[in-house]
């Protein structure tokens, strides 16, 4: 069974965490960063990119790079604001009124759930790589103010990514889990969550392992990106006044403005003024145009006054629903990177009257809480009870277009509520149930989650039939509605999908497409890695050949060097032709050839360590002879002689007595063996004289050595081990070599 992880699917960045050893831990991605940009792109070659790689092509390829997808999940096209639709890529409406993302590179459209699924799959693969085992389940966080269709769309995204979504968890609730896990005292916590695209406020009571949500509120169309857009509009208006060009009409210029605005917002959190320089932002027929300006913190805060007012309303509503006063709050936990802005922190101080707690990492705390919830579901974390609430009221439409609420907002979940309804006309045999979510009194002002019909009602006067409608919300916040005719017992149950979410058939099709594309991506990745390995091996082989040439000379292992050079040429040719099969064969051949060369190099190094000073002389002699190195090493022994031939200086192996060599005058007994001096064979005592025919008095000359068949002195010398071109050493001057029969030239005793 695979692991269950916690995932914070954010508008700007996403984070994944897991329980390890009873403690939550954030997993870094392949780039070594703990947060992954929530960006998906398609390169010009058709490769799908997720995360930092996709973010890098935002400026150069804006139409095929998709960011801020979370704002489109589970929403109809008519529900989007103009600011939400102002993105560098194309967002269109499909025939059903849902949102579709256009990808010109692939000539197809994506649902927001599909794009979100690519991000989730990327995070799951990173976790699998780190853990060494597959990730099959996940707890995914959503803003607390997400409605039912948005939650269902998030669940669909997880299914498309191949994950079993164990729980849909509210982000403020997850943050409270991470904050209060080790706390045993009772506290009232206010979680202020300002992310990239959403804003939530939740009030919780934490103590003794119980996390009870008292109230929640928020705005799903308010986040840090809205602060960026204020800077973008300010820059664009300034440039329009100065140059008469609206940069917002140029996709690349707009993306550069967005990146510059985000950078300026981050810098203004630490400094009071920042410079914005965008050279070559656009060009006219005459010259290129540059954008250079300066933005102060006070100017930035003045641009965002209305956004701060929008944050005050959910904050006050959450306190009111929890029936608490600001002084009743014990701790304020800031969640989301946008809470680092000084004006946001000052807003919290002014409304709550308490300094915000900044001990937690606002970028990672939600994912850590999701991992804790995953540990609770897996049984790794015990003695933790989480009581969440539904963020919005649920009900149905009645006569006159009025909404009848069955489950008020901030009701603890899971929950089941029922009510009895009747027909509006005489002899009515069918009832249509219209499910709504929201806080407005009239049905048209609320979110429509879906409709279904209950048929087979017996004809009866108006108001006589009794239809029991039940709303059931599970721990994930997913709504299930059932209608029961109490007269006939006929019942119909439906899980609300939401008008803007995908059908089951579409989800299954997208799951197959995602798996197919994932397989194609794996194959493409393997192909790229193979080419990288080939290029790396080529560079290593060429460097190795250069090193061996410098260390051992150009003639060392010449055949193996030629084999490697030939294989390198073949490998480069296969790389140029993109021949994968030939590439595999050439890679294996080059690896084998390089291994053989390294083996011979290692053997030569071992021999050099044993032979020391004489090895360079041996190499010189071998190069003069033109012999192969290995044959040369095999045929020469440690004494410098041929190990396959008998030692010509070994008298015990000669069949013909050697009489020509006179050693009786010297106290040294034949110390020369090859060119070396052998100390152990040196004796200071004279040899016994050769017995003569005169009774051993030494007056009779010995038998001379026969001339025929006797080699000359130079021919009888063994080859020199040091490969020197100098003539071999001659015997000591006190000795004579009986070279002939001339008695006048010979010396006798």
Swiss-Prot record:
Record keywords, A-Z: ATP-binding, Chaperone, Nucleotide-binding, Phosphoprotein, Stress response
Keyword Transcription: no
Modified residues (Phosphothreonine): 198
Feature: compositional bias, Basic and acidic residues: 643-653, 661-694, 711-724
GO molecular function, one term: unfolded protein binding
Induction note: By stress conditions e.g. heat shock.
The protein's role, per its UniProt record: Acts as a chaperone.
Span list, region Disordered: 643-749
Protein name: Chaperone protein DnaK 1
